Amino acid sequence: MHRLLSLGLCNLLSPSILARVSAMSIIGRRGIHFLHKLNAENVPGALIEHGQSRLIDASLTLIRESAKLRGELVRALGGAVASTSLLGVPLGHNSSFLQGPAFAPPRIREAIWCGSTNSTTEEGKELRDPRVLTDVGDIPVQEIRDCGVEDDRLMNVISESVKLVMEQDPLRPLVLGGDHSISYPVVRAVSEKLGGPVDILHLDAHPDIYDAFEGNVYSHASSFARIMEGGYARRLLQVGIRSINIEGREQGKRFGVEQYEMRTFSRDRHFLENLKLGEGVKGVYISIDVDCLDPAFAPGVSHIEPGGLSFRDVLNILHNLQGDIVAADVVEFNPQRDTVDGMTAMVAAKLVRELAAKISK
């Protein structure tokens, strides 16, 4: 009946109204960014370009000055060889399913400082000490996209922001996603800034190594293909894999990726809990997709995949890792799928806390 009424209504509407309804349906799926693009043809191209450049310059200035202030503080306190600094990248549009990870950075920050826990990590480091953890804020991703900035340029903004943090020695970036597409511009920036490749420890339910998932070279399912193509990593170890198809395995072989699947984790455990990485390269990069964890521990993710790592499995791997960690990210927490008490936010926050302790020295 509803379908018949719908068909009847369509017959009564003019083609122009139907076109507008169709356009609004597309806008609903793609967001306000697409609405701006619909009107862009009525605005001079030079005006759009100038406006985009001004907003990007302002965004980079904010990150630059924030990082400079934190760097000066850490250097004034003295004694730090490496100090973790948070950088938020609230980006979700490259997700193949849900875009909720765009809302994750503020939820993670809130959970880091939640009154239900203290500010000391398991290894005894005090997060309130700026030499252990500072925060330079978020890249205004949505505002940049609302100006019509495409992904090529947006990825460059992310890379440049990471480099601005790294310029303030001894700050090292710990990036809060966002979907997993952010790892590509972050790793690229780290490798370019340090002048060579890194070793990557990647914890995830998925290999994220499609050539171009659904035609999107910047898809969150393709980030590690871009990283390996660019020569930004020497070794890529993927741990926690339990959702992988033929292309994922073939791409892994193509790039020489070391894939450790959950079905063999009991056999691989000793090796993975005693990793030594980064020798002969510029250091170690750690990328943690929250869905590497079993959904019993972290239900607030876009792609729920049972049979994952326990939280203690992940901490054992991190705590025992030997190597100089130069940067890291925590991605794919989706607050829109979290429990009412914010369980996954607390899980993501503890991952950040323990990573901060591991990076800082």
Question: What are the residue ranges of the model-derived segments?
Answer:
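Conserved alpha-helical scaffold segments that buttress catalytic/binding sites
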Residues: H33-K361
